[in-house]
């Protein structure tokens, strides 16, 4: 067997393994429908984009994701883990549920029950409306601010929309205020 052919036989399987691993990192969470991957359905396009990115972040750094919801949304870590691993909730749904609950001053279990009762076909906007929390309301604003804060905690880049830029400024402006 020539050296070139032998090299190709060794390199090709390695390349296929690496390509498979790269594709797996971008795969949706188990149990997530293809529709859910296209849009999280919060009623706010900016929030939807961030929630889908949170799915990617949580797939790569599940412990950091769970720490974030436990620490800043006061969701017990064991409960978040159960939603993620046993009930197969996508990270975006866990994040949205717990930070919406915190922003609207609702018990997190009430928001989780509302989501579960509505079923997988229901959007988060429908669930939030049923809880009397409409997109554009103050709790939604607090949710948007929480997303920015999470990205800052994770030291993850985020593109703010015009409203958030006016409210929060850029990262350099947010960092000194976060330290206080």
Task: Locate each region found by the language model.
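Conserved, charge-rich beta-strand/loop surface module that forms ligand/interface-binding patches
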Residues: 28-29, 41, 45
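A generic alpha-helix preference that emphasizes hydrophobic side chains
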Residues: 19-23, 91
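N-terminal secretory signal peptides that target proteins for export/translocation
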Residues: 1-4
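Mature extracellular/secreted ectodomains of secretory-pathway proteins
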Residues: 43-179
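Bacterial N-terminal signal peptides
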Residues: 8-19
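Boundary at the C-terminal end of the N-terminal hydrophobic targeting segment
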Residues: 22-36
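Terminal, positively biased "leader/anchor" segments
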Residues: 35-38, 110
């Amino acid at each position: 067997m020539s050296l070139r052919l032998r090299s190709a036989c060794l390199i090709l399987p390695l390349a296929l393994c690496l390509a498979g691993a790269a594709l797996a990192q971008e795969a949706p969470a188990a149990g997530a429908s293809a529709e859910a991957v296209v849009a999280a359905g919060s009623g706010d396009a900016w929030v939807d984009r961030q929630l889908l990115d949170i799915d990617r972040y949580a797939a790569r750094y599940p412990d950091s994701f769970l720490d974030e919801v436990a620490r800043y949304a006061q969701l017990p870590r064991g409960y978040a883990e159960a939603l993620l691993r046993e009930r197969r909730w996508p990270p975006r749904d866990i994040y949205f549920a717990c930070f919406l609950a915190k922003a609207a001053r609702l018990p997190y279990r009430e928001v989780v029950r509302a989501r579960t009762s509505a079923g997988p076909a229901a959007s988060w906007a429908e669930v939030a409306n049923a809880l009397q929390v409409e997109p554009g309301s103050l709790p939604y604003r607090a949710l948007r601010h929480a997303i920015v804060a999470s990205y800052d905690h994770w030291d993850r880049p985020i593109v703010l929309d015009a409203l958030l830029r006016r409210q929060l400024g850029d990262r350099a402006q947010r960092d000194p205020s976060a330290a206080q």
